[in-house]
Structure formats: C-alpha cells, structure tokens
C-alpha cells in the first residue's frame, strides 16, 4: 500500500513538473529579477549599479507616470463595467431559444482569437480621418470628419471601444456557461408564482451568475491594467494624443526599450504589480458580500 501511494505521488509530481517549471522560468524568477532591477540602474551593456530607492523617488515626482496612471484607471473604470455589462446582455440573449446560436457565438468570439496587431490595424483604418468607414458613415448625418486617434479628447475612448470589442467574446462564453448551470426548475417555480422575466433576471439569474461575474471581473480588470498592444498599434508615438492615451505598461515599454532605462522601467512594473495585487485582494475581501456561494 505504501509503495502504491509513493508511486502515485511520484507520477503526480512528475505530471505537474512541466507546469511548475514553466511558472518558475516565465513568472516567478522574472518577478524577483524585476523587483531587484527596480533598485538598480542598468547600463546599455547589461552592467547594473545599486541605486536604492532612487527609481521610486523619481517615479513619484514624474508627471508622465501620474498621467499614465490616470489614463490606466480611466481604461479600467470605463472598459471593465461597460464590457462586462455588454457581455452579460449578449450571454443572456444567446441563452434564449434563438436561431443560429452557434453562428453568433463564433462571430462574437472571433475578436478574442484575432491577433492584437491585426485588430489594431483594422480599427486604425476604421478610425482614419480621411477614408475611415466611421467618418464616412457619420458624414451622412452632417458630422465633420474627426481625427479620432490624434485628438487628445477622443483617443482614449477610441481605444476603449476596441478593448471592449476584443474582450466581449471571452467574457460572454464564461457567462454563458454560468447561465447554463442555473437549474431550470428555479425558473419554472418562478413562473408558477407569477414572476415576470425581469424579476426572474434580477432575483434568480443575476444572483446565481455572480460567481461567473466575479471571475470575469477579476480577469478583465487585470488584463485592462496591463493594456499595451492596442495602444501601441493604434496611437502614433508622435501624435499629440499620445500623452492622453499612454498606459503605465506603455510607459514601461518606452523607458525599457526606447530610453534604455531598464531600472526605472522595472520600478514602474513593480508599482503596477502592487496596484493590481491590492485591488484584486480588495475584490476577494468584499467577495462574500455579493457573490452567491
């Protein structure tokens, strides 16, 4: 019996070893390396000099950082609730008896599997001031052509639309799975009691969907805090709107790969990680107050 348990444990550890090694090599070790580098100044040829908290002191008086942090929170505050709301509505509609369910699911999920570079290029064309399809359609209603991505007022919101569009499909599939796990007997009992569809949604569907909503909220929040690729593809770095649309990760990229200030960039990454962890822990703390278990 003891040998059998030992053998089972051996095969268990052996099977999880690839995942563990992947986590160590690509996540855990780089995390501690980044944290160490945030206290150093790294030269062009890789040599590092210990500077202590200088990088962090520089960040807290850097107007660029505060602007990028403000932009990042704007992305989160707008894209997360709006994206989840749209995904929920679509999931509820696709959970009803409608034709071509599979086709609609595929169409809504396509942006998820599309490369960010390709999506960014397509939307950049849609937003183009001179020959973009959006301005072309708006011109029929008497609107003048708008430079969506080069206007400091509109650039951030133009990027938000694309972010929501790219995440809707994934969130919708998760929420749809949550909807299908709700017992139909609850709806049948509610109908017998005379509850309308709206009351069924708010008193049955929404409460029982909260575990899925919580998961989707956490994942969407983290990915939105890390937004970079869409901004990089859509907003020109020489545009007058770049300061109004730059995220913290975009600023990290600029300092790490354009200015070659990798120590400062590592400090930016460490601060963003701390912010994400704190907000995620806060969500887990208040989870019991609204998530159905």
PLM feature spans:
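A structural signal for multi-pass alpha-helical bundles of membrane permease subunits
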Residues: 4-293
């Amino acid at each position: 019996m003891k040998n059998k348990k030992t053998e089972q444990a051996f095969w268990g550890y052996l099977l999880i070893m690839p995942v563990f090694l992947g986590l160590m090599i690509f996540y855990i070790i780089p995390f501690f390396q980044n944290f160490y580098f945030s206290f150093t100044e790294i030269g062009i040829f890789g040599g590092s000099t210990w500077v202590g908290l200088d990088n962090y002191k520089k960040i807290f008086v850097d107007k660029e950082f505060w602007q990028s942090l403000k932009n990042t929170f704007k992305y989160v505050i707008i894209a997360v609730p709006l994206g989840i709301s749209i995904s929920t509505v679509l999931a509820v509609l696709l959970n009803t008896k409608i034709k071509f369910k599979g086709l609609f699911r595929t169409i809504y999920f396509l942006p998820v599997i599309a490369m960010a570079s390709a999506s960014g290029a397509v939307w950049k064309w849609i937003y183009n001031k001179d020959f973009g399809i959006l301005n072309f359609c708006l011109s029929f209603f008497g609107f003048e052509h708008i430079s969506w991505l080069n206007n400091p007022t509109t650039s951030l919101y133009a990027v938000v639309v694309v972010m929501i569009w790219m995440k809707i499909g994934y969130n919708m599939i998760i929420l749809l799975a949550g909807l299908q796990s709700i017992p139909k007997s609850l709806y049948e009992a509610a109908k017998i009691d005379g509850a309308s569809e709206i009351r069924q949604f708010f008193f049955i569907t929404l409460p029982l969907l909260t575990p899925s909503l919580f998961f989707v909220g956490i994942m969407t929040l983290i990915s939105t805090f890390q937004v970079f690729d869409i901004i990089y593809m859509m907003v020109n770095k020489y545009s007058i709107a770049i300061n109004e649309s730059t995220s913290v990760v975009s600023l990290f990229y600029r300092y790490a790969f354009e200015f070659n200030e990798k120590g400062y960039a590592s400090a930016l990454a460490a601060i963003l990680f701390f912010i994400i962890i704190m907000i995620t822990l806060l969500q887990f703390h208040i989870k019991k107050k609204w998530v159905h278990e």
